[in-house]
Each structure stands twice: as structure tokens, then as C-alpha cells.
Curated annotation (Swiss-Prot):
One of the record's GO cellular component terms: proton-transporting ATP synthase complex
Matching CDD domains: ATP-synt_Fo_b
Subunit-structure text: F-type ATPases have 2 components, F(1) - the catalytic core - and F(0) - the membrane proton channel. F(1) has five subunits: alpha(3), beta(3), gamma(1), delta(1), epsilon(1). F(0) has three main subunits: a(1), b(2) and c(10-14). The alpha and beta chains form an alternating ring which encloses part of the gamma chain. F(1) is attached to F(0) by a central stalk formed by the gamma and epsilon chains, while a peripheral stalk is formed by the delta and b chains.
Molecular function as annotated in GO: proton-transporting ATP synthase activity, rotational mechanism; proton-transporting ATPase activity, rotational mechanism
Function: F(1)F(0) ATP synthase produces ATP from ADP in the presence of a proton or sodium gradient. F-type ATPases consist of two structural domains, F(1) containing the extramembraneous catalytic core and F(0) containing the membrane proton channel, linked together by a central stalk and a peripheral stalk. During catalysis, ATP synthesis in the catalytic domain of F(1) is coupled via a rotary mechanism of the central stalk subunits to proton translocation.
Subcellular location: Cell membrane
Name of the protein in its database record: ATP synthase subunit b
Gene this protein is translated from: atpF
Keyword field: ATP synthesis, Cell membrane, CF(0), Hydrogen ion transport, Ion transport, Membrane, Transmembrane, Transmembrane helix, Transport
Transmembrane segments: 11-31
Domain of life per record: Bacteria
Xref: InterPro entries: ATP_synth_B-like_membr_sf, ATP_synth_b/b'su_bac/chlpt, ATP_synth_F0_bsu_bac, ATP_synthase_B_chain
Amino acid sequence: MNLNATILGQAISFVLFVWFCMKYIWPPIILAIETRQKEIKESLTNAKKARDELYILEKKIHQNIIDAKQKASNILNSANKQKVSILEDARNQALEESKKIILNTQSEINIAITHARKNLHKEVVDLSISMAEKIIKKNISKDDNQELLDELVTSLSQVKN
């Protein structure tokens, strides 16, 4: 066989092989490559969207945490103010109660003092009458009468004080 015929046969075989590959093998490979490229692009796009959404969610969560801390702080401040108010009210009530008790006790003491003074005055009057009876019954001298009267006046002045 001739070298030219061999080269020509190989060239024709090569062209037929290339045509066959381009017609039947190349399109599915290109289609698979393009499909894979689309999937990769979609995956990258989805990953970017997910990253952006994650960033937005992180911001929202961070803001929610800040808001929750602020609300907790407000609640604590409100509770502290309410505690102070309740304690102040309780202290004021206790002071008012103690004042009422003191006033009641003082009025009871004043009543007891007045009652004691009345009883003392009654006893002094009874004593005076008793002394006067003794003076009248004894009919003693003027000096003795004067001495008894002085004692009576002294005892009366001590009782009044």
C-alpha cells in the first residue's frame, strides 16, 4: 500500500471520528458541563443569598438581644422604683401608726393623770375634812390648831404640785 493512500485513509477515518464525536459524544458532554456550570452558579447564588440572609438574621438577633437587655433593664428599674415606693409607703404607714399609738398612749396617760389627780384631790378633801373633824373634836389650843392647819396647807401644796 501506498503511504499517501494510508495517510488519506487515516485522514478520512479521523474526520469521520471527529464528525461522529461532534455529532453523538460532544453534545451530551457539553450539556453535562453546561448543566454543571448552571448548578454551580445556582449554588453560589444560593450560598450568597444564604450568607446575606444569615447576616441580616444576625443583625436582627443582635438587635433583639439589645432590645431584650433594654427591656430587662427597664423592668429591673421599674421593679426597683416600685420596691422603693412600697418601702417608702410602708415606712410612712408605720410612722403614722406609731404616731397614732403614741397619741393614744399619751391621751391614756393624760386620762390616768387626770383620774389620779381627781382621786388625790378627793383624798386631800377627805383628809382635810378628817383633820377638821379632829380639830373640832379635840378642842385644843390655838397653837395646836395653827400647827395642824400649817401641816394641812403644806400637805395640800405638796399634793397640788
